[in-house]
């Protein structure tokens, strides 16, 4: 899969999202926005995280999920169940996690503003993504 950085990019977002088998694939990175698609296996999760200066939009294309959010890492308590066609807007600074509660892969796409990942980022698994993020944050 090739990323289409800073060029007009027309796509079937539902097909791109459902056909993605990687934990995370960056499809497009612009000056102020980034598009990624994710496939989260049954029983797995994105992982509790916060983007200090990045707003995030998530949309579920397939599967079922539980969204958990909170103002601090210790106070994550607000929950919502997500089904296909549900979208979530997560303001910068909000702790959040998306947990796959279904029996099949959860397929979501995400818009970050500004970009959260390096252009062209592909993480085949959550473990690969966690290791890369630990390196980025000097935790490895």
Range-by-range predicted roles:
Residues 37, 67-69, 108:
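Short hydrophobic/aromatic-rich beta-strand segments that constitute the beta-sheet cores
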Residues 57, 103-120:
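A short hydrophobic beta-strand segment most commonly corresponding to one strand
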Residues 33, 42, 53, 94-95, ...:
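A generic "binding-loop/recognition-motif" signal
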């Amino acid at each position: 899969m090739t990323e289409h950085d800073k060029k007009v990019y027309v796509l079937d977002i539902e097909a791109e999202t459902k056909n993605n088998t990687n934990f995370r694939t960056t499809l497009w990175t612009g000056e102020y926005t980034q598009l990624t698609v994710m496939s989260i296996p049954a029983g797995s999760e994105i992982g509790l995280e916060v983007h200090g200066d990045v707003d995030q939009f998530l949309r579920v294309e397939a599967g079922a999920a539980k969204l958990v959010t909170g103002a601090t890492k210790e106070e994550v308590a607000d929950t919502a169940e997500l089904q296909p066609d549900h979208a979530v807007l997560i303001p910068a600074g909000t702790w959040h996690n998306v947990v796959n509660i279904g029996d099949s892969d959860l397929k979501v796409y995400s818009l970050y503003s500004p970009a959260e990942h390096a252009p062209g980022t592909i993480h085949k698994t959550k473990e690969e993504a966690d290791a890369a993020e630990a390196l980025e944050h000097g935790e490895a």
